Structures are given as structure tokens and as C-alpha cells.
Regions:
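Histidine/acidic-residue-rich, glycine-tolerant segments that coordinate divalent metal ions
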Residues: 59, 81-83, 87-99, 105-106, ...
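Non-cysteine beta-strand/loop elements that form the S-adenosyl-L-methionine
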Residues: 73-75, 187, 345-350
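Divalent metal-coordination and catalytic microenvironments
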Residues: 21, 61, 74, 104, ...
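Metal-dependent amide/peptide-bond hydrolase catalytic core
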Residues: 212-392
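Hydrophobic beta-strand positions in extracellular immunoglobulin-like domains
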Residues: 63, 191-193, 258
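Active-site beta-loop-alpha junctions enriched in small/polar residues
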Residues: 26, 77-79, 136-138, 165, ...
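Hydrophobic face of alpha-helices
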Residues: 14, 32-39, 111, 208, ...
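Acidic/His- and Gly-rich active-site-bordering loop/insert found
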Residues: 1-100, 109-125
């Protein structure tokens, strides 16, 4: 039996689970009921289940093959976002202010479908398949925390995962090698000037003016400090300063992010930002501090893993379903796994205007064409089987 033969059989199963999870979202590190539901369903399949009882969220399922061998993990993230859903379909979020607006409901459903297929094909599995249902991806710290649970990560030899992607037409799959998603870091800038009366600016050092100048000058980091052949995004997302209409504020704080693909350039980027921040403030008689927090490294696919994934997609779904897609600037904490184990992170197309699947990830009207998810389940299952067979 091949996973392609089970796609139609489990199509409704995978769709139903995606819609169940969509209706019952839980935020990062609060996925308690989600974890219980996943554990119960996996146990009903005869899968060995290990729940992170210390945190109460996240679990590892293990499918033992008919023959001994190495171990590979298939990963799905399970957390939702603090978004008020504006969709009107009957499986919209039942929880006020919480929504699966990124697609993790689809990821869980895909992995449950893969588990169903794998348990039906144990005779083809030469080793162990770990099913990693990871909490708190949206925090950026979910993966490194989850890696410590039950020593599971030390027991595996490779890993595979993916993300449903709204920019890719439904049914297409992208598995290219190399950088696929960007590193994500947070920047905080604190400006200190001198508070004063709104009618006497000459006696103050206006933190709003300083902050505004910093924002404008930071644009030159990308345009004049980075090669045009490299990719860097620098965004300031918020500015907070002052509280009264007639008072010149003496302090301001800004928050933002940088995204990039080349880890070797990170120090250069940070020092360029720091130089602009500090020296712009000095030009106005103020001071400014840059606080830099690394969230996730870039997601970089192993060449051999991607080559295998291409063969699996073609063999399982047909060559017409394999798509080339440009790397993207959002970050993904799956990158932490790929820093230590060979693996592949795939993009799964879900865009379909006929079902309203056109809104971007994190939008309050985000949805997906979930009719294609069982095909992704088949790719997950076949990748695990193929990898174990080729790495005896």
C-alpha cells in the first residue's frame, strides 16, 4: 500500500479535524485541551503517546515500524493567535479573541492524517516515526523549549515539517533546498532627551523629534549599508512617547524587527543599526539605547533532504504538484530543529478564491482550502517511510 492510495479515504477525516481545531483555538503555552484531544486521538490509533505533563501542553507520538532502524520526526505546531475572527462559516472560532489565523489547525490535521496512514502501513516502516505536536510556535521559543522534553530530539536522526501557505495555489507543494524563511529578531530602542514645556522647546530635548529622526535614518541601513544582492527587512512597528498635549516628552520607546537570511551578516546588521540609533540621538543632544533580541534563526533546508522531498512529492502526487516558490521573510521556529538535525520544511499551497482562501496569514478572515490537506498528509507519511528506507 502507498500513501497516495489513502488520500481520498482520509480526505474528510483530515478536513474534519482541521475544522474542529479551528473552532477550538488555544494560545501559545495554553494548548491544554488541544493536547488532550490529540493524545486521545493518537492513542485510539495505537500510537505510543508521551505528553509533556510538566507544562501540560505538547506531546510526542511514536509509531514503531515493523522493522528496526533509525528515527525521523514529523512536526506540527498547535497554537493559535490572539485575533478576533471575522469569518462567518459554521466552524469559526468559538473563543472570543482567539483564532487559528496562521494555519496551525491545518498542520495538526495534516499530521493526524499522516499518523492514520502510517499506522496502516507499519509493514513499510523501517524504524520509528516520531510525531511532534509542538506548542508555542508563535512565541519563537516553542521549539527550543520543546526540544528539551523527554529527550525525544536526541533520539531522532532527521525531521520534516511544513506550513500551509496562502500565496501558493491549493494543492501545490514547495520543498526547495537552502534558505526558505528568514531569521527573526526583535529590536527595542529607548530614547532619552529632556522633558519641557510645549511652549519652550529650546529648553527641552524633544524625544519625539529624536525618535522620528532615528526612524527615518534607519531606512539607510537597508539602502546604504547592505548589498543589493542580500535580503534585509527592518521595520519599526510602534512608537510610544509622551502623554500630554502641552508637554515635550523627554523619553520615547520604539519596537521593531529585522529579518534576514545570512547568519554571517547578522553582526554587521546589528552594528549598523546601533550606530545609526546612537549617533542620531547624539546629533540632537539626546542618548539612545538599542536592545537586540534574537527570536529565531533562518530556516534552511538540507540539500539532500529537499532532494528526497522532491522525489516523494512527484511519486505521491505527480510532477505537476511540485512547485518552485521564492523564500519568504516571515520567521519560523522550526529553524531551531534544522540547526541540529538534517531536514526539510515544506510550503503547502492552500489558496483558493472559490472558498474565500485569499486572506493573508494573521488576518482575521484567514482560511484555507482544506480539501488538499490529506494530500499533504500523504507526503508527510511517504517522506518518513522513504527517509528511513534510505538511511538504514
Amino acid at each position: 500500500m502507498h500513501s497516495r492510495d489513502l488520500i481520498e479515504q482520509y480526505k474528510t477525516y483530515v478536513q474534519d479535524w482541521r475544522r474542529y481545531f479551528h473552532k477550538h483555538p488555544e494560545l501559545s503555552n495554553e494548548e491544554f485541551e488541544t493536547t488532550k484531544t490529540l493524545a486521545k486521538e493518537l492513542e485510539s490509533m495505537g500510537v505510543e503517546v508521551h505528553v509533556d505533563t510538566e507544562r501540560g501542553t505538547g506531546l510526542i507520538g511514536i509509531i514503531h515500524g515493523a522493522k528496526p532502524g533509525k528515527a525521523i520526526a514529523l512536526r506540527a505546531d498547535i497554537d493559535a493567535l490572539p485575533v478576533q475572527e471575522h469569518n462567518t462559516f459554521d466552524f469559526k472560532s468559538d473563543v472570543d479573541g482567539k483564532m487559528h489565523a496562521c494555519g496551525h489547525d491545518g498542520h495538526m490535521a495534516i499530521l493526524l492524517g499522516a499518523a492514520k496512514m502510517l499506522t496502516a502501513m507499519k509493514d513499510r516502516i523501517e524504524g520509528d516515526v516520531y510525531l511532534a505536536f509542538q506548542p508555542a510556535e508563535e512565541t519563537g521559543a516553542g521549539a527550543p523549549d520543546f526540544m528539551q522534553f523527554d529527550n525525544w530530539f536526541e533520539k531522532i536522526d532527521a525531521i520534516f515539517g511544513g506550513h500551509v501557505w496562502i500565496d501558493l495555489p491549493a494543492g501545490l507543494i514547495s520543498v526547495e533546498e537552502g534558505p526558505r524563511m528568514a531569521a527573526s529578531s526583535k529590536i527595542t530602542i529607548r530614547v532619552k532627551g529632556k522633558q519641557g514645556h510645549g511652549a519652550q522647546p529650546h529648553q527641552a530635548i524633544d524625544a519625539v523629534v529624536v525618535a522620528s529622526a532615528i526612524v527615518m535614518n534607519l531606512q539607510t541601513v537597508v539602502s546604504r549599508n547592505v548589498s543589493a544582492l542580500d535580503s534585509l527587512v527592518l521595520t519599526i512597528g510602534n512608537i510610544h512617547s509622551g502623554s500630554e498635549w502641552n508637554v515635550i516628552p523627554g523619553e520615547a520607546q520604539m519596537g521593531g524587527t529585522i529579518r534576514f537570511f545570512d547568519p554571517a551578516q547578522e553582526d554587521h546588521y546589528v552594528e549598523s543599526i546601533r550606530r545609526v540609533v546612537e549617533h542620531t540621538a547624539l546629533a540632537y543632544g539626546a542618548t539612545a539605547e538599542l536592545i537586540y533580541e534574537k527570536k529565531v534563526p533562518p530556516t534552511i533546508n538540507d540539500a539532500a533532504a529537499s532532494e528526497l522531498a522532491e522525489r516523494v512529492v512527484i511519486d505521491t502526487l505527480g510532477k505537476e504538484k511540485l512547485s518552485k516558490m521564492r523564500k519568504v521573510m516571515p520567521g519560523e521556529d522550526f529553524a531551531w530543529y534544522l540547526q541540529e538535525k538534517p531536514g526539510c520544511f515544506t510550503f503547502i499551497g492552500i489558496q483558493n478564491p472559490e472558498v474565500g482562501a485569499t486572506f493573508d496569514h494573521h488576518n482575521n478572515r484567514f482560511t484555507m482550502d482544506d480539501s488538499v490537506l490529506s494530500a499533504a498528509s500523504a507526503v508527510y507519511a511517504e517522506y518518513a517511510i522513504a527517509w528511513l528506507k534510505e538511511h538504514k
